[in-house]
């Protein structure tokens, strides 16, 4: 089909005229072909245009900025946030409410910690383990010179109400295992046992606070909560009450309630903890609490060690958010120590209605920040008046002494942030464990060996270490038995060790820890004298001790405490850094003959070894003919290569099978040798105990360890080095070197 060009152009004359008019438009900038500029930048010549004009109004000429501003606002308006961002806060609150014991319950400071700490699941909670920053030494330094805070809100508060509640709950406690007795409302630490099973049936430590004759508050570690509640319910025949907001158990006489969510507990440690706390709170002007406030101010200005351990101070403060401003310096009046004589105790914290009223009056965060920004000095006071309890912790444990703070849960995070803005350093579980070791105190439940919680933590640690050990290649694993002669590298086996040292005719008994403080003091005096220890040689009794290395050495957990020989003591006096090496276990006579024959065969020297032959044929080597001719096909090369690879695979498989069978035989031989060897004599020095914790002390500059030794061995080591000093040999489970260390009885009770 053909068309006539003249008729086609005549029919479209008007369209062509409009196109030419648009192209030749004098109003447009030179070079533009569009009708009317679409943006402000297109009104400029090409040499004046910049890509940044779409974002920065200052790129336009001054005469065009007012016109271009409207284009930029409409084009770059803030877009709507994503669906995830819009629902982030609501999802966080929902997730906080959904957190259960299976995934780990969140504490009130969880979000703050999760941004700064590595979180782990422990005892049914999500807890902060260690900081992302490298502040391990800084935390220890501040715990001795400044102030450190730890969140211990995972402790469980159990309230017991009945007539003479303190005497009834004392059925689970042993008087000789605790320190000083409390006065009035003071808090004290008890060691809980199953009724009628002492010295066995240890449950764990707990803190008691009695308000009156009919009410006692007990703070207990979550790892021992189930065992304690089970024993309490069975002993008093308590029944759980249904349709109640909190866990409630009672009978005709006793009422037991568990409050694990409404109260938070913080621990401040360090010499400046009271002064930091004073600068972080704003007191409510209430006459009822004026004497308590004055007493706290007098204590905060005085020497911290002058306060009594367990002393309770009740305070009423404003909303902690009112002290968030770092520039605001709170000025409190100075009060003398004589305020103690006029002190009137007022306690509103344990009044549930008073706490709930403060929670209801708490101002929302959005409203608080709105009012705080509109006022010159910020918000100074709100309707919410927060009751808190301050508990002095003066136990003589260096890095652990300080104060505990009890505060209602909705105000806990605000109070935490207020302390952070005053320079208080936060720490996690690893730092707390290190602080216990620096203070030479047992850390419950990881260092405890007599309770169910301690045994469970030991099994969990054993499982973790075995998985890590089996994950290494065979040639990178430590040969604990054949190389360093360690029978149990990942466990303690206290029952077996105590039985090996049971030299009397008394019946076999399970291992238990001596926690009687008076008995431990008598044992320490007897060790200094070197006599009178025979009466304490009970079968199965373990004595907690602390070890101080005075030479080289860095003790570790699962280290062995051994009995030194006379030669060891002589060599230590000459050179305390001399290394005593552990020899591997002796093999049987048949095995030794084989080893000797193999050594003779390997040492056999050839006739002409070391001489060069002068014969020409001696230096000749066979040459492969295939390498001389290039006529070999590629197919032959591929076939040869494939055969070579397959041959290597078969050889490697055969070699692995032989090595696997060899390792299996060696493991069976080792098991037979272990069964035939007593735990006590498994090393070339008699084992008398094990280490449950140990590390190089940052503050002292030498190795420090904590462990247990059998009571039957005390007479063998008493004052063996000096009139008042006892020395033992310590060896780690992965080392072959023995190191000397002073041993001292640990007289501090296990505390939380």
UniProtKB/Swiss-Prot annotation:
Q: Which Pfam families match?
A: POP1_C, POP1_N, POPLD
Q: Which GO terms describe its molecular function?
A: hydrolase activity; RNA binding
List localization entries.
Answer: Nucleus, Nucleolus
Disordered: annotated span: 638-663
Signal sequence annotation: none
Tell me the keywords, alphabetical order.
Hydrolase, Nucleus, RNA-binding, tRNA processing
Which ranges are annotated Basic residues under compositional bias?
640-657
Q: What class of enzyme is it?
A: hydrolase
GO terms, biological process = tRNA 5'-leader removal; tRNA processing
Q: Which InterPro entries match?
A: Pop1, POP1_C, Pop1_N, POPLD_dom
User: What catalytic reaction does the record list?
Assistant: Endonucleolytic cleavage of RNA, removing 5'-extranucleotides from tRNA precursor
Oligomeric form and interacting partners? Component of nuclear RNase P and RNase MRP ribonucleoproteins. Several subunits of RNase P are also part of the RNase MRP complex.
List the protein's name.
Answer: Ribonucleases P/MRP protein subunit popl-1
The record's gene field reads popl-1
């Amino acid at each position: 089909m053909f068309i006539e060009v003249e008729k086609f152009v005549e029919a479209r004359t008007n369209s062509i005229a409009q196109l030419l008019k648009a192209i030749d438009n004098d109003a447009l900038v030179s070079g533009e072909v569009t009708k009317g500029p679409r943006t402000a930048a297109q009104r400029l010549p090409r040499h004046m245009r910049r890509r940044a004009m779409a974002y920065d109004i200052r790129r336009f000429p001054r005469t065009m900025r007012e016109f271009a501003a409207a284009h930029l606002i409409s084009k770059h308006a803030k877009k709507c946030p994503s669906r995830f961002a819009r629902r982030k806060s609501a999802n966080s609150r929902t997730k906080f409410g959904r957190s259960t014991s299976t995934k780990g319950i969140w504490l009130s400071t969880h979000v703050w910690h999760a941004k700064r700490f590595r979180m782990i699941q422990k005892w049914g909670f999500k807890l902060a383990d260690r900081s992302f920053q490298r502040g391990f030494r800084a935390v220890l330094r501040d715990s001795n010179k400044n102030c450190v805070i730890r969140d211990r809100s995972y402790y469980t508060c159990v309230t017991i109400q009945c007539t003479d509640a303190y005497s009834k709950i004392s059925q689970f406690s042993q008087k000789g295992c605790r320190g000083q007795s409390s006065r009035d409302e003071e808090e004290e630490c008890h060691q809980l046992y199953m009724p009628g099973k002492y010295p066995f049936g240890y449950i764990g430590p707990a803190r008691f606070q009695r308000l009156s004759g009919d009410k006692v508050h007990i703070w207990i570690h979550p790892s021992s909560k189930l065992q304690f509640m089970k024993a309490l319910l069975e002993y008093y025949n308590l029944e759980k009450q249904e349709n109640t907001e909190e866990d409630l158990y009672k009978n005709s006489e006793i009422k037991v309630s568990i409050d694990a969510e409404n109260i938070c507990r913080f621990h401040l440690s360090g010499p400046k903890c009271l002064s930091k706390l004073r600068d972080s709170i704003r007191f409510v002007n209430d006459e009822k609490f004026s004497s308590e406030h004055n007493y706290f101010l007098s204590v905060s200005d005085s020497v911290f060690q002058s306060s009594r351990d367990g002393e309770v101070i009740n305070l009423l403060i404003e909303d902690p958010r009112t002290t968030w401003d770092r520039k605001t310096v709170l000025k409190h009046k100075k009060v003398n120590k004589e305020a103690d004589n006029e002190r009137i105790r007022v306690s509103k914290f344990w009044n549930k209605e008073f706490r709930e009223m403060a929670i209801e009056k708490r101002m929302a965060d959005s409203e608080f920040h709105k009012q705080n920004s509109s006022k010159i000095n910020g918000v100074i006071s709100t309707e919410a008046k927060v009751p808190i309890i301050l508990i002095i912790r003066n136990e003589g444990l260096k890095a652990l002494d300080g104060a505990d703070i009890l505060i209602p849960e909705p105000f806990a995070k605000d109070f935490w942030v207020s302390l952070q803005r005053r320079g208080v350093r936060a720490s996690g579980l690893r730092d707390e464990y290190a602080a216990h070791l620096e203070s030479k105190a047992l850390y419950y439940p990881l260092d405890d060996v007599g309770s169910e919680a301690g045994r469970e933590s030991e099994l969990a640690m054993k499982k973790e270490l075995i998985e890590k050990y089996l994950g290494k290649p065979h040639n990178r694993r430590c040969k604990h038995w054949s190389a360093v002669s360690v029978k149990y590298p990942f466990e303690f086996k206290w029952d077996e060790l105590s039985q090996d040292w049971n030299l009397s005719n008394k019946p076999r008994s399970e291992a238990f820890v001596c926690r009687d403080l008076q008995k431990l003091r008598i044992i320490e005096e007897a060790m200094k004298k070197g006599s009178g220890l025979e009466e304490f040689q009970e079968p199965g009794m373990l004595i907690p001790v602390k070890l101080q290395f005075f030479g080289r050495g860095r003790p570790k957990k699962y280290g062995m405490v051994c009995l030194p020989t006379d030669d060891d003591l002589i060599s230590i006096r000459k050179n305390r850094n001399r290394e005593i090496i552990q020899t591997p276990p002796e093999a049987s006579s048949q095995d030794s003959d084989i080893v000797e024959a193999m050594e003779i065969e390997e040492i056999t020297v050839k006739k002409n070894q070391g001489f060069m032959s002068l014969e020409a044929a001696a230096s000749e080597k066979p040459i492969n003919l295939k390498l001389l001719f290039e006529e070999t096909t590629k197919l032959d090369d591929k076939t040869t290569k494939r055969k070579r690879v397959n041959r290597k695979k078969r050889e490697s498989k055969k070699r692995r099978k032989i090595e696997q069978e060899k390792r299996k035989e060696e493991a069976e031989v080792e098991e037979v040798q272990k069964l035939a060897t007593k735990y006590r004599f498994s090393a070339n020095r008699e084992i008398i105990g094990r280490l449950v914790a140990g590390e190089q002390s940052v503050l002292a500059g030498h190795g420090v360890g904590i462990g247990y030794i059998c009571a039957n061995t005390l007479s063998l080591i008493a004052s063996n080095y000096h009139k008042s000093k006892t020395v033992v040999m310590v060896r780690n489970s992965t080392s072959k070197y023995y190191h000397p260390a002073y041993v001292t009885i640990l007289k501090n009770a296990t505390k939380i």
